[in-house]
Amino acid sequence: MSKGIHWVRNDQRLSDNPALSKALSECEEVLLVYAFDDRIWQPGRIGPYRAKFILQSLDSLRQGVESLGGVLTFVHGRASGEIPQLMRSWGAERCYGQREDAWEETEEEKALGREVDLRLTEGKGLLEEEDLPFSLADMPGVFSPFRRKVEKNLTIRPELP
């Protein structure tokens, strides 16, 4: 039986979540994991309003996961240190997550990817590169021509389960 871990980060949705959908389609069992990274969760680094918002979002996600019979697991520390240990103890073969763009997040992806089979997906934007009717090199430099080309050729992707 194949097992995988879905690394919960900034995309805390159960529906229309490309990384979670990929994990569920490739694994028979998926454990959702959120890492409270001490480098981020410290005074002065994260404000009280942002912290409250994230905690409320995680609680909502936890309730949604539990309503489906699953578990949202929380670990304390860097994902690159905690997730490999959890994968070994649970017998998971792969880790899935959404690709991030910020420097610290991409460094953490690289560190985790050196330890486990990490499969990252896009999914933060309304459009992905392959949806564009032109290459990035040929992208219009002004919004109006961009919008006209995209609107003329746009096929809206169906929502993921």
Each language-model region and where it sits:
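Surface-exposed loop/turn segments and immediately adjacent short secondary-structure elements
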Residues: 161
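Trp/Phe/Arg-rich N-terminal binding region typifying the photolyase-homology
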Residues: 1-158
